Structure formats: structure tokens, C-alpha cells
């Protein structure tokens, strides 16, 4: 399962402001480029709604219908298999059961919290949009346990293995990323 964040380490207020048409177009292009590097470009990219119930016909906000739906339609017109917006509380159970391999979360905790709840420390942070493969462990720096001989190396090994597996197809990801202004 690959989870992409339209916004990352910003406040929720800032994330809502940052979810805009250009950002959504760019993230969908980057996810598509990444899926092509994995030779899985035909798999759908599931986009999570920003608001509860993906806005529920604009009852809970207009961002889903005004920003996300048009971005998904533009992606489809460009040949990208994007679907949504799907309410996050529906999207995640479907993803865990295998329906989706590529997800776009609108903000950090919408993507990170459920991923960590299901997969724990078995995640790898992949930075898409750079000319080189850049990965890191998904759990942070762990400064609180540094020097205590209790850190586990499994996450680092997983990150290194993922970097090696991605390196061969990375040029296609970078080519697509360099055409956008980034996210």
C-alpha cells in the first residue's frame, strides 16, 4: 500500500488552505509517475475526501466538490486512473482489504494515523519528486532512545531494501516530477 500526502507537516488549517487545484493536479501526476515506475500504472489512485463523508453533498464543506472532484476529472482526462473523493472512513477499510494500492490523503494525519495503526513500523517514507531515490524510516528519528541499545534496525533495513527496489525505475518518476512545480 502506497499512501501519498497532498500536504504534510502543516497545521490542519494550513492543510485545508493548501489543498488547491494545482497541488491536487501535481500530486495525482506524481502518484501516476510512481505507479508507472512500479509497472502498476493501471491501478486506480484512490483520493480521500478532505471533509467528513467527502463533504456529503457540500453539507460539510465545498472543497471536495469544488477542488478534489475537478482534479480527479482532469486526471482522468489525462489518462490517469483516479477515483474519488472517497470518505476516509470508507477508503481505509477498503485499502486494508486490498481494493486500493495507491491512496492520496489530503493531510498528514488522514494518511499517517491509519497507516501506522495497521502497519506499525513496517512503513517506509519515500520522497517522490527528487532526482534521486530518497527514503527514510517512517517512525521518526527516535532521539528519545538514542544510545540506550534498544533501537531496532528492521525499519532501516526495510527502507534500504525499498530504495534498492525503486532505483531502477526512478528516472520516469523524476521526469514526471520535473514537469510539475512539485507539491
Named regions from a protein language model:
Residues 1-63, 69-183:
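Anion-binding alpha/beta catalytic cores of soluble intermediary-metabolism enzymes, centered on
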